[in-house]
Amino acid sequence: MERIVVTLGERSYPITIASGLFNEPASFLPLKSGEQVMLVTNETLAPLYLDKVRGVLEQAGVNVDSVILPDGEQYKSLAVLDTVFTALLQKPHGRDTTLVALGGGVVGDLTGFAAASYQRGVRFIQVPTTLLSQVDSSVGGKTAVNHPLGKNMIGAFYQPASVVVDLDCLKTLPPRELASGLAEVIKYGIILDGAFFNWLEENLDALLRLDGPAMAYCIRRCCELKAEVVAADERETGLRALLNLGHTFGHAIEAEMGYGNWLHGEAVAAGMVMAARTSERLGQFSSAETQRIITLLTRAGLPVNGPREMSAQAYLPHMLRDKKVLAGEIRLILPLAIGKSEVRSGVSHELVLNAIADCQSA
């Protein structure tokens, strides 16, 4: 069992990583006997894990209600969020309740925002079931729902009480979702840890076949890196922005193509190549390093070009609505070397458009 602590003073919390955690009531600390829980999951995961998690919580004496949401990025919306509030109010659940997010990034982000908002804030626990949510979205307290005009535009910073990563969940993950998660894994190597990127080049095949020790190390290293960044910059005023490599381009793809048509990791993968091409055009990143990124993403089964039907010009309106925009200027996360990156403002729209075009004609 691996345990990592996100250090945020009184709001510090553990990330527990192991197989078989759904069999152990102690995995879901700080829940105690007699407490009330609303378990939030989706229609795909409910048949797989709902009864198991409900059972282990009830074994610990916890009173469990549940709400099952539709599955898909297109349902990460205010309308679906309202169904969680309705379920909480109908029981009713008070300010002493705990929300448990059993699912991937959509369930986790939406449940976290529900917890931040319900009665001005209740406790919640993240139980991520996808690789993407285990290495990224469940850690750090970013919660949100989407708006038709932009991804994650309505949300809050709100930290969980704990994160429970059961590696066994990956056994039921579709290959496309596994690849989507690997995009965020590769991101950590590009922005923060060149040695980890080297390790990924050597061990990607083991990850694709869900090798236990390799996957445990991979998830642990990603969580360590994210925990360090969040502890240093919880509300994304500086360092934490680096975690958005590829996301300014990627969110544009998701919004333009319709949420759910491109998985988040797929859009981020293409966006990371666009960021690398932008950095190349600025003369601060080599084509050889871009090729290393492209090769690793391709091996993972991820796209390295944007949608053919989406023009370069179509990216700009979405990018100008990005949450990182300051004083009307797009701020981009750009690699400087494998393992090193920067936040860059003032890049001309023409250069950005040319970099996007590079990734459409490649």
Curated annotation (Swiss-Prot):
**What note does UniProt attach to the cofactor annotation?**
Binds 1 divalent metal cation per subunit. Can use either Co(2+) or Zn(2+).
Write down the chemical reaction(s) this protein catalyses: 7-phospho-2-dehydro-3-deoxy-D-arabino-heptonate = 3-dehydroquinate + phosphate
UniProt GO MF annotations: 3-dehydroquinate synthase activity; metal ion binding; nucleotide binding
* Cofactor(s) required, per the database record: Co(2+); Zn(2+); NAD(+)
List ligand-binding residues for Zn(2+). 184, 247, 264
Subcellular compartments: Cytoplasm
Q: Does the keyword Ribosomal protein apply?
A: no
For this chain, the family text in UniProt reads:
Belongs to the sugar phosphate cyclases superfamily. Dehydroquinate synthase family.
HAMAP family membership: DHQ_synthase (MF_00110)
Identify this protein by name.
3-dehydroquinate synthase
Which gene is this protein's source? aroB
